[in-house]
Amino acid sequence: MNDFYATLDLNISSLTPRSVKLLAFLQAHADKEGVSFWSKRKTCEALGISESTYARALRELTRAGLVEVKPRFDENGRQRSNTYRVVNTKGLKYRADMDDVEKLHHREMKVYSQIMLQIGEDSWAISRRSLADACGCSKRSISRLVAALRDKGILCVRAEDRSFMGNKGQSFNRFRRYKPAELLLLRCILLMLLSSLNTPV
């Protein structure tokens, strides 16, 4: 099980969802120097995207100064696959199970990244409107995407309100990432439930 680390300090609403997912993938498969040797073909297969989509996303990341592309050549001067270096930026560092992250839809990945950038080591409270503005999508989309992340067991979401603060009970969500031990416990419980359903009475 690989872990996904991200250290980003940018407003991801300026990036397309596919660019965010490609950036996360390159980070997860980079060495200690931040360099990824994955070829375009292998990356497209892993992410389930076309080569033209890959090219557009990579072009967006290079223009934003987040990824540097360096050509490689063999001893005969023939070009090999490029290397991709993720430029380190200041920001929060967070971790998630890469197996889970790779399965996220592009838009789920964008919302997940925005939440994780803010969540830090504890929890983070935000209104649906604020999260929608940060991600550049509608409040309805945020509700649907957050529910999907919650149902996949990636986020712990708790609805709260500020009625005690005298602001007419404005509602907001508090997000907390599951720790590895909690994820393991949740998966064990799920397996036990599935096993009990398959056991004849």
Q: What is each residue range found by the language model?
A:
Residues 1-201:
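Electropositive, intrinsically flexible nucleic-acid-contacting patches
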